[in-house]
Amino acid sequence: HNPSITAERVEVCPNSIELYGKESEYNNGGLLQKLNIPTDKLLLIYGGNLGRPQGIDFLMDVLAANEKRTDTYFVVVGNGTEYGKISQWFRNNTPHNSCLIPSLPKQEYDDLVSACNVGLIFLDNRFTIPNYPSRLLSYLENRMPVLMATDMNTDIGPIAEKNGYGLWTESGNLETFMEMVEFVT
């Protein structure tokens, strides 16, 4: 993205963590039960900032499309400038296959991520600079596949596909995103 900088001056320094077996104070779906999240569906989680850069309108389109399914459930956890907008969407639509959780203590959030099956990353399709959301790390730490809908300038999706841990489409492409959901079920 910066052709004026020579390749010899650029170094990739990837984020990394050690993967260990994790212990949770919840077992047998206790946390899911506490949060009224079903245990008999594939659980897809979006956790983090709910702001304009995340393309919340497309996330809401995905949640609406998911209402036609009976085997998947979307868990949205977070806060941000667009929280009111998505909260209003939940009040107006009362979806059966998704929930909105405003925030959780870190350990409880980590336990929730580990109880889910698929991670989600959304970015607004109007981004013009690369963006690499850090929420990916908690998904990878839990060895979960990741579905991504981002702009064309962010390379997180192609990197995920190349390395076999996720699927990607451009944000706004609802048909392909729902095909990705079907693929992971």
Regions found by a protein language model. Give the residues of each.
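Carbohydrate-associated surface elements
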Residues: 13-16
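Charged active-site motifs of nucleotide-sugar-dependent glycosyltransferases
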Residues: 9, 37-44, 72-73
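Short donor-sugar binding/catalytic loops of nucleotide-sugar-dependent glycosyltransferases
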Residues: 47-52, 66, 80, 104
